[in-house]
Amino acid sequence: MKSLQKGFTLIELMIVVAIIGILAAFAIPAYNDYIARTQVSEGVSLADGLKIRIADNLQDGDCVTKGDSSTGEVGNEDKGKYALATILGTPAQNLSELKAEDPNGCQVKIEYGKGTSGGSVSALINNTELVLAQLANGSYKKESSTVKDKFLPKALKENK
């Protein structure tokens, strides 16, 4: 009488493990890139939040204000989980004469790895920075970056 096979053979299990290993070899780097892109996007979102502060500062004639946190006055930086965004620059002369796509002289410097979480920043972007120049229409243009282009949002890649 023949006995019925119950379970899997060692070869079948080894094949399954090999297939999982091959899939993981492709999936893990792609996942790490995804994490880095997400964290870079957080920094760009912080810069978007600083647009209103820059506009307020420009009303006073400068890109940077002398904020005082003890009095509740808003400062020139915004800290997220993975990045720190800081307002820099000197306003261009004759702001009212600038075209919409001309830089207004104000910049936002985004430093990755200086956020509130410290060590949980992706190693692919840790200790890198992205400097965005604000245009007269309020949008941003990439001015300089040590962040690899593949991690930048599409709008910044197209707007070099």
UniProtKB/Swiss-Prot annotation:
Pfam family, one: N_methyl
GO biological process: cell adhesion
Residues spanning the membrane: 8-28
Modified residues (N-methylphenylalanine): 8
Positions of the pro-segment in this chain: 1-7
InterPro entries per record: N_methyl_site (IPR012902), Pilin (IPR001082), Pilin-like (IPR045584), T4P/T2SS_Core (IPR050470)
Subcellular location: Fimbrium; Membrane
SUPFAM superfamilies per record: Pili subunits (SSF54523)
Topological category with respect to the lipid bilayer: Single-pass membrane protein
Domain of life of the source: Bacteria
Role noted for this protein: Major component of the type IV fimbriae that plays an essential role in twitching motility, natural transformation, and protease secretion.
Subunit structure: The pili are polar flexible filaments of about 5.4 nanometers diameter and 2.5 micrometers average length; they consist of only a single polypeptide chain arranged in a helical configuration of five subunits per turn in the assembled pilus.
Protein name in UniProt: Type IV major fimbrial protein FimA
Highest classification ranks of the organism: Bacteria, Pseudomonadati, Pseudomonadota, Gammaproteobacteria, Cardiobacteriales
